[in-house]
């Protein structure tokens, strides 16, 4: 029976010319280690016959392959999500280190379908980001992914309430809603009637925009009358019908804030009406909203800074992959952009 003492982490560290903490990081992935350093640790462990050499080898192999980021976005038919997807692909290529990017678009936004697609995507990537409604089924799916795959999951565009998230990257929707209210209060006649259109109350971003919009007018322009909120379910046809009915019922309407999807339908409705042009504020600069600004159908656009948001999200996901044990929840709020016919 051999009296030789077992090889320790200290022995491996000395043979590799690194500290014990570095060997621990390679084994337990507590933090990022440069590939060259990890390879030295592996070679030293193999030479010495370290009992955990198999684990070190698997870690080195895992860490040597390109990272893959997964994104679950909404319909490709929506100009905003086409642009966001292009920005994410560019950010993945340009960042350091470059990563692979797997982007999936959803037409079916029912919570059960979103949850199922999230579960499948999580099996193919190292980190996930999604745009989703704040629904218990979706939040439970995120918690299951984090528990089963030890995978960082981020919310983007619209935050979520589950504590399992690694973070949120987007704009400050409270400020966005207040800015919309400020614009309407300055551009509409005093004591006007104004309307608000959402895609769904389930999206926290839209809920926050609505709350802050109403809050600002209540605080700074109480003479304004805000009508009951309309909901489009992110559907352009429903949005068009809702606005046409709104204009029929309220011919004295002075302004409208479109805080959700379906802007294509809203623009069509406003162009078809013989009534005087409304002060219209909506979200996100696309080919459709740019043209609507230029022809006067839309007054102002509050827009997500898509290239900056894509880079911030990819950077956050890279960092989360390399520090999986971090309990810190990232909150990255980027400033939104304001466009009118004067600066598009």
Task: Mark where each language-model region is.
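Flexible loop/hinge segments that line or gate small-molecule binding clefts
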Residues: 137-175, 286-294
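Hydrophobic alpha-helical
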Residues: 127-146, 231-288
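N-terminal helix-turn-helix DNA-binding module of bacterial transcription factors
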Residues: 1-57
